[in-house]
Amino acid sequence: MSRINKFVLTVSLLIFIMISAVACGIYTQMVKERVYSLKQSVIDTAFAVANIAEYRRSVAIDLINTLNPTEEQLLVGLRTAYADSVSPSYLYDVGPYLISSDECIQVKEFEKNYCADIMQVVKYRHVKNTGFISFDGKTFVYYLYPVTHNRSLIFLLGLERFSLLSKSLAMDSENLMFSLFKNGKPVTGDEYNAKNAIFTVSEAMEHFAYLPTGLYVFAYKKDVYLRVCTLIIFFAALVAVISGASCLYLVRRVINRGIVEKEAIINNHFERVLDGGLFFSAADVKKLYSMYNSAFLDDLTKAMGRKSFDEDLKALPEKGGYLCLFDVDKFKNINDTFGHLLGDEVLMKVVKILKSQIPVDKGKVYRFGGDEFAVIYTGGTLEELLSILKEIVHFQVGSINLSTSIGVAHSNECPTVERLKMLADERLYKSKKNGRAQISWQ
């Protein structure tokens, strides 16, 4: 695995861990807050029930203090008052009942009468208290409020309704669990199982006088919590994979672009990045181009210099290709007859012709000095090379006809580069000996 791949993998892993940890942490905190909100909803529900029970007691006391009614008159007055101000239907299942030491009267009409059961179960009839009462296969929370020294009102609320009302006030109620235990036995709420619950909170609630005594248990459904966390982790993994792939793509593009720029500069193809690249501005490229020319190129012809030739020749046996040595025929006579300015034009023209014919990825032109040149060709066949070299066997500068003599040798013909140079040089002189203006490759 490359260093880049390791780096991208590390970044992706960090992204995955960070998103998973942060998102799951936030979700966990939300779940815990919802569990505590359910606890508060139970307290608020009990408080609301107690307040309405207290309101109904105050109605009865006002009637007694104002009218000093008989039992029958008090009952009629309560029914009338409650009819004028009906309590919310979601709070009460049955009642209230007016009870004394030896009598129980149903205040609301047209309901099932539980007086006999109440008289049998409720022991403290003249002391304010709350608790549980069960009859007819149902369990109720009861609130008992004295209205006179020997009469009290008792209000009943079904535990199932109490539980539903409490959960309805909390967020995400369908995934919350609420159970109430009395003497170690479940009284109401969800079927609590520790294996299926998470973030369990339990409290006796003894310090709340308006709550029935018991153990209140609040929790969140474990399977829902784990399912959401799994989705979060999957999403984090997806984001990490996409981020990693994008990062790897961008890094590889940057590196590939850098490689292209490096090779363009190293191989003297500055035109590819002259307009500015990823790592080098146009000004940087021009400076590098100038430095490169000074170090590696012939100032006059812009052919590669002797240093580059020696380096490329060493690599030729491994790559496989041709070495061509040539010079301009009777170049001294040209200089003596027409002057050095024309001589320079001749040298530049030879290099220009070859550069226009040789693809940049297949060969290079070198100048050793004077009219001595070389070509290293690695990208094609002998026929292709001969076709290129024929362009300089005969050529013109202005109206002057000129020619070159060329010797060609292949790297497979010689065991060393020194012998390869000697063979190409021998064939160059063979071309001159045979009348110049020709190519010798055998």
From Swiss-Prot:
Record's bilayer topology term: Lipid-anchor
Lipidation (N-palmitoyl cysteine): 24
Binding-site list for Mg(2+): 327, 371
Location in or out of the cell: Cell membrane
Occurrences of domain GGDEF (ranges): 319-442
Main location: membrane
Pathway(s) served: Purine metabolism; 3',5'-cyclic di-GMP biosynthesis
Pfam families: GAPES2 (PF17156), GGDEF (PF00990)
UniProt cross-references to InterPro entries, sorted A to Z: Diguanylate_Cyclase, GAPES2, GGDEF_dom, Nucleotide_cyclase, Rev_trsase/Diguanyl_cyclase
Domain of life the protein comes from: Bacteria
Binding site for substrate: 335, 340, 344
An example Gene Ontology CC term for this record: plasma membrane
Subunit structure of this chain's protein: Homodimer.
Protein name: Probable diguanylate cyclase DgcI
Originating species: Escherichia coli (strain K12)
Organism classification: Bacteria, Pseudomonadati, Pseudomonadota, Gammaproteobacteria, Enterobacterales
